[in-house]
């Protein structure tokens, strides 16, 4: 397919891919015949892969996901269902974690200052029984949120400016202030490299 496009309109200057094995092989074969064509990684997929490498080995992350599943099940069909965590997607789940982290942060604040809908009485005991486990993630939630901030800033920059000579330096100056914890600093370096 790539050769067909190249015959019709000339070899592309660059090919953006999501780093899947099949496409990587095709791009590598194409580059043999067209060495001036460069391969660029799709930024959202690249960031999702970096995030997966960061979070998957962390036992706190798997514990958190299991806790979210329990909270989702326990809150269904209750007056607290409006607080249920968003459903996590099996496919491309690391591309959609910002919603889960935002939910956890907002629900954690809700635990401290609950404001129930007008027609729903507050049952503090039930609220704590279902969502109180979020308290044990206070420290790491801030770390995870910083990763989400780094990802969002990177996506915004690349979507607006594209890939260009000097992009690394520009991103470094935008991301360094966001690297305020032990988890974020190496993550910024991985994003930039």
Label for each model-derived stretch:
Residues 1, 42, 95-96:
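Helix N-terminus capping/helix-initiation residues
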Residues 1-15:
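Short, basic/hydrophobic alpha-helical segments
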Residues 15, 19-20, 27-72:
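Conserved beta-strand -> loop -> alpha-helix junction used to position metal-binding or nucleic-acid-contacting
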